[in-house]
């Protein structure tokens, strides 16, 4: 049972759903008539993005990128590897990155800078979780659902070695699970 590896539930499924509803309402107002491209960062953003888009009541397009900066461990390497780029030309378009968590900030800072170079009309960031204590670069999300302490979290898309993504909540992983 996956629950046996969880120290505590940090954010419940109901809290995530409610936060996605509120954020969806805000994005509906902010992007009305702009037809933004929501870019989900794979793989972790899938559950959050799927919940979020159900609550956005304006035209949007969706695309995805697969970018890695974690290489099987618990700390970001700082090296950004784009495994899959967006399929659309974003020049002149409003782009909203949808992310599961901002930790060091390196991945999103690099992506934001890259999309500005591609001449996007605007580049903003929405994240389910923000962990400011982990930040090593200057970057802030434009939309944040939850600010969390500097603990190793899994669930709702977040993983440890590709496991735990399917938990319906955000939980703190027991240290003995990842320290071995």
Curated annotation (Swiss-Prot):
Its EC number is 2.4.2.8. Diphosphate binds at residues 43-44, 165. Pfam families: Pribosyltran. The keyword Metal-binding applies. Purine salvage pathway enzyme that catalyzes the transfer of the ribosyl-5-phosphate group from 5-phospho-alpha-D-ribose 1-diphosphate (PRPP) to the N9 position of the 6-oxopurines hypoxanthine and guanine to form the corresponding ribonucleotides IMP (inosine 5'-monophosphate) and GMP (guanosine 5'-monophosphate), with the release of PPi. Belongs to the purine/pyrimidine phosphoribosyltransferase family. This is Hypoxanthine-guanine phosphoribosyltransferase. The gene is hpt.
């Amino acid at each position: 049972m996956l629950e046996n590896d969880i120290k505590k539930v940090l954010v419940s499924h109901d809290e995530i759903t409610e936060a996605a509803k509120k954020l969806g309402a805000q994005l509906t107002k902010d992007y009305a008539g702009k037809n933004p491209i929501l870019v989900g960062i794979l793989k972790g953003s899938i559950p959050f993005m799927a919940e979020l888009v159900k609550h956005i009541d304006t035209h949007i397009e969706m695309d995805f990128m697969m970018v890695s900066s974690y290489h099987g461990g618990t700390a970001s390497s700082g090296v950004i590897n784009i495994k899959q780029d967006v399929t659309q030309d974003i020049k002149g378009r409003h782009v909203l990155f949808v992310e599961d968590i901002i930790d060091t900030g390196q991945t999103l800072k690099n992506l934001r800078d890259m999309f500005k170079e591609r001449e996007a009309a605007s580049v903003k960031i929405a994240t389910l979780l923000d962990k400011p204590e982990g930040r090593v670069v200057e970057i802030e999300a434009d939309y944040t659902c939850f600010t969390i302490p500097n603990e190793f979290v899994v669930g709702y898309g977040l993983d440890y070695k590709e496991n735990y993504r399917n938990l319906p909540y955000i939980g703190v992983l027991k240290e003995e699970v990842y320290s071995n």
